[in-house]
Every structure is written in C-alpha cells, then in structure tokens.
C-alpha cells in the first residue's frame, strides 16, 4: 500500500517523493454544471510531472439524488466525468485501471423526503454510470460518508447487490462513518473486496455520539493501528491518501502514524 495525498501546496511538489508520497488525488469541479471548471489533461500532467507522482484518483462531488429520487443532470455530469477519467488512462500508477471517486453530497434534506425514493434514485443513477464505467474500463469508488446518501457499509452493500456491476467499488475513509454507522473492523472486512482506494483523516465526537469535527490523522479518536492492520489484511488498495492536514507538520505526523501502524501490522503478520 503506497502513500498519497490530495493535490495542493502544503508541501512542495519536488519534495513529495522524498517524503514518501507517490501519488496525488485530484478533483473535477463539483455539481451538474462544473464542466468549464474541470482541469484539462495538461493541467493534471503539470501537477503529476512536478512531483514525479502518479494519479491516485479523480474525484467528483455531486448529489445524484434529491428528496424525491435521481437527478438526471447529475447523472449526465458524472458520466461525462467517467469519460474524462478514462481519457487519463496511463497516469494512474499502481491502480489497475482509472479511478473516479464519487463523493455524495449531504443526504437529501426536505420536509417530505421519501427515503425509499432516495435509495431507488441511487440505484437509478448509478446503473448507467457503472455501465459507462464498464464500457470505458473505469473503476467507480463511492466515498461512504455519514452525512451523505451512502452513509454506511451496509448501504453500500445493498447498492452493490442491486446494481451488480463490477465497476462499482468503495473509497474507504473510516473516519467518515466509523464507529457510529458501522464498527471499524466489520466495516473494513465487509468492504474489503470492493475497496478501490483508502483515505486517512480523523474524527472527534460529541457526547451525544454525533461527529463534532474532522482533522488530520492523530487529532481524533480513530484507532489507526486497527484501521491500517485491517486495510492490509482485507483490501487490495494500491494507495492510501491523506487529507484534512492544514500544515506540513500535520501531514508528516500523519505519515509517521501510518508508517508505524504499517510496520506493526507487518510484524504481527509474520508471527
């Protein structure tokens, strides 16, 4: 499992390899009408070449569903991003195929939300998206997040059963839904065969059990020794991508925490 990070300027590109980071994750512009804001292949190449890094994944933030079901404009936008991701083939390093992370926006919020329609809308939206991904040899990775329309391991597995596409996988960021939605070890074990990429950040909780804040690895309560051990044991992910760091020191502390957990897991596996 190689280390990556979100594209940005916290660390100079020329330092990335020396600091142990081999890939960056980049973003399409969010929303249904974001095409004009998307990076061009030349823009992406400039970032990758500056750090001699691979592209861990492209990312799209989009709703796909509203209170009454699927949003056609978001579906069409996501399919366009699938095509743009496919056009970046050859840049994705250790990934067996191009990866598009879909990050759901917040769970539809309205006085008359039809929860069944939300789930059916997800199925309606993801079916043509996955068909396009299959045709173009792209892997879709759904980022499970407690505030979004795919909020637990169980919800993803229900979607996977309904859609039945090998193109539908998971972006596993445990801080997004553990332990209040799905317990940590169960989450990684259940999602392991479907996990395409993993993320690293941390989360703190209020007394009532709701999430309070997100931050860099080490700033919250996630058990990183267990998280990394389970990722190595149960998933085939090529890249573990760091996020929510605000400073260079944040990032390097997070890197050292993950490296230590990887070392401990390696020792355990040899016993």
Language model features with spans:
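Structural detector of well-ordered beta-strand residues that form the stable sheet scaffold
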Residues: 4, 56, 100-101, 141, ...
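Basic- and aromatic-lined ligand-binding clefts that recognize polyanionic substrates
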Residues: 135-163
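Structural motif corresponding to the early beta-alpha repeats
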Residues: 22, 26-121, 176, 237-239
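Histidine/acidic residue-rich metal-binding segments in metalloenzymes
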Residues: 123-131
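Histidine-acidic metal/acid-base catalytic patches
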Residues: 2, 9-20, 51, 74-84, ...
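Hydrophobic alpha-helical segments and helix-packing faces
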Residues: 119-122, 149-153, 184
């Amino acid at each position: 499992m190689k280390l990556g990070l979100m594209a940005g300027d916290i660390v100079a590109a020329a330092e990335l390899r020396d600091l142990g980071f081999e890939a960056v994750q980049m973003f399409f512009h969010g929303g249904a009408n974001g095409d004009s804001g998307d990076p061009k292949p030349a823009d992406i190449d400039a970032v990758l070449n500056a750090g001699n890094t691979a592209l861990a994944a492209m990312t799209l933030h989009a709703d796909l569903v509203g209170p009454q079901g699927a949003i056609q404009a978001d579906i069409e936008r996501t399919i366009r991003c699938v095509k743009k991701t496919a056009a970046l083939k050859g840049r994705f390093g250790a990934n067996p195929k191009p990866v598009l992370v879909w990050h759901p926006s917040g769970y539809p919020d309205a006085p008359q939300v039809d929860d069944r329609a939300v789930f059916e809308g997800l199925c309606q939206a993801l079916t043509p998206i996955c068909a396009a991904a299959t045709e173009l040899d792209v892997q879709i990775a759904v980022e499970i997040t407690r505030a979004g329309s795919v909020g637990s391991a169980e919800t993803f597995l229900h979607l996977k059963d309904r859609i039945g596409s090998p193109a539908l996988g998971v972006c596993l960021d445990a801080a997004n839904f553990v332990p209040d939605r799905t317990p940590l070890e169960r989450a990684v074990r259940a999602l392991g065969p479907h996990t395409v990429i993993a993320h690293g950040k941390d989360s703190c909780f209020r007394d009532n059990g709701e999430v309070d804040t997100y931050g860099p690895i080490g700033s919250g309560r996630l058990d990183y020794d267990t998280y990394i051990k389970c990722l190595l044991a149960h998933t085939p992910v090529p890249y573990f991508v760091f996020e929510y760091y605000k400073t260079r020191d944040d990032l390097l502390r997070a890197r050292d925490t993950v490296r230590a957990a990887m070392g401990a897991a390696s020792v355990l596996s040899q016993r």
